[in-house]
Amino acid sequence: NDHMHPSDVKEGKIELIADCDGLLKVDREKLKKVNSLGEMMIATRHGDTYVKKGDKLAGTRIIPLVIKKEKMETAQAVCSDGPILTLKPFHKKKFAVLTTGNEVYYHRIEDTFTPVIQEKLAEFGAEMIFHEVYDDDASKITDGCRRAMEAGADLVFCTGGMSVDPDDKTPLAIKNTGARIVSYGAPVLPGAMFLLAYAENGTPIVG
């Protein structure tokens, strides 16, 4: 498929190599059908995973020394309407970080999370174009979200103020932008109060 190439045949095996960084998608139903034919196999990485250029995506081979032509044609027919593997290249995005909370705003604690976000998104070629610090004032945070999107941010991060304490205003601020909240809370630690919303223009806002 696009953005990948086969290796040379070695010991009866062919591997697929990624030509770019991206998200690997696997059609599990087609993979199961081919692997259920017998006398052949395809082993892949898990779908919906991040891969880098040069990574091995899959390995395939026939098990016996020879195989009937009809069986190979059946395997080809399974993929006649689309591939088993798809690699979706990453597109460089611009993002904004709104650091929220009285503790950071009044310099009681240091903002240590913004550098973490920058470092992680740099792996995907993303660029931070907007960064401001706010106290626990919902209206200011709401305005900051709007200005970040007006500045061209493809993704907005709001860090801090996400718990259930009375002075944590970030969820309300995100809601007041008019964004549609998809999820508030996730079964992960740290990150149990993770929030995902989409603004009216489709921009993701993450808290």
Which residues are covered by each model-predicted region?
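Short glycine/threonine-rich loop/turn motifs
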Residues: N102, A126-G207
